[in-house]
From Swiss-Prot:
It comes from Photobacterium profundum (strain SS9). Belongs to the putative dsDNA mimic protein family. It comes from the Bacteria. SUPFAM superfamilies: Putative dsDNA mimic. InterPro entries: dsDNA_mimic_put, Put_dsDNA_mimic_sf. This is Putative double-stranded DNA mimic protein PBPRA1522. May act as a double-stranded DNA (dsDNA) mimic. Probably regulates the activity of a dsDNA-binding protein. Disulfide bonds: none annotated.
């Protein structure tokens, strides 16, 4: 597939955030939902990161890093500006003809 036909990373982030918001209340602990909601305006982030190699063990197929993007959603540490409280790691297809999303939720 030509990379020009792939969904942009910005659109992938937007889709990931929409999916996260829709599923968070059912998938996270109530305290994490409250924490995320209360602090998102000041510290919240959704960002595309380098797709890690462990996804194949979670989804059962080899992940093409051109066709799939990893998005992390969580809270940024104000001291070092790092997204270190991750509520969800998401693998999303960038192929508009092959919709796919897999989420690894935060577990305490």
């Amino acid at each position: 597939m030509e990379t020009s036909n792939l969904i942009s990373y910005d659109d992938v982030i937007d889709a990931a955030y929409d999916i996260f918001l829709e599923m968070a209340s059912e998938s996270l602990e109530p305290v994490d939902v409250i924490l995320f909601t209360a602090q998102f305006d000041d510290r919240g982030a959704a960002e595309a990161v380098e797709t890690r190699d462990d996804w194949s063990s979670h989804v059962g197929f080899d992940v093409d890093k051109e066709l799939y993007a990893e998005v992390r959603i969580g809270l940024v540490n104000e001291e070092n500006d790092q997204l270190d409280d991750v509520f969800a790691r998401m693998l999303i297809s960038r192929d508009p003809d092959h919709k796919f999303c897999h989420i690894l939720w935060k577990r305490d």
